[in-house]
């Protein structure tokens, strides 16, 4: 792969996710902390109006506005559609990028700790993630759906990925998570600098990759009303194994609903507040061990 010349850090794609938004504000106030000799680092506050309002979005979810067809559709005129076009104008598209790496900062009410969310398994990204999880075992790595036709901001770039941290409430700054996220960003930038110098560290360990397999909705009645909640046995237990027969939900009348799958899964984004409107109680993943150097 060619030399890294420009890196973009985006925060506040969702306006009430303060960790990323305030990190971007810090980096804009003290740009020297993210600059490296061999590449430029630029910062973008993703959704300024939503950030000012303390809301996830103004009219629609900005992180669902980056489908190529949507970016080319001049009839889409919501604030977030316009903002997506502006951001794409800076970052470029996957087939014509203006930057080499995109880091999109997010936070979650789920207990995701320090997570890297990938939309593809590019060898460069896998080696980066293997390095990050090797030096900090608390870093988890997820692989979601293939990015071809994706509407996420990260899909604008082949080397785009998300840093997702939690648990933290919406519209709240948590100093510990802020500092951990900040340090993770510095580690990533250091890695990119070493890559440009040809000094990539060799990783011998396998990478644990949590691969997305599907979503699960809450129990509902015939009117679509929620009739249950996350069972206390799995609340805040993201990335832990869920076996067939384990309790999954607790209904309003106190009955446990078990996981009826046939294989062990590893739930993530358990009880994410922003996913209630999307009909998602959690995401299921399967755990794979891969060799990033193969």
UniProtKB/Swiss-Prot annotation:
Family recorded in the similarity comment: Belongs to the AspA/AstE family. Aspartoacylase subfamily.
Disulfide links within the chain: none
Residues annotated as binding substrate: 56, 63-64, 164, 275
Gene Ontology CC, one term: cytosol
Organism name: Nostoc sp. (strain PCC 7120 / SAG 25.82 / UTEX 2576)
Named cofactor requirement(s): Zn(2+)
Reaction(s) the record says it catalyses: an N-acyl-L-aspartate + H2O = a carboxylate + L-aspartate
Enzyme class: hydrolase
Any GO molecular function: zinc ion binding
Ligand binding (Zn(2+)): 14, 17, 106
Protein name (record): Probable aspartoacylase
Highest rank taxon of the organism: Bacteria
UniProt keyword annotations, A-Z: Hydrolase, Metal-binding, Zinc
The protein's Enzyme Commission number: 3.5.1.15
CC cofactor note: Binds 1 zinc ion per subunit.
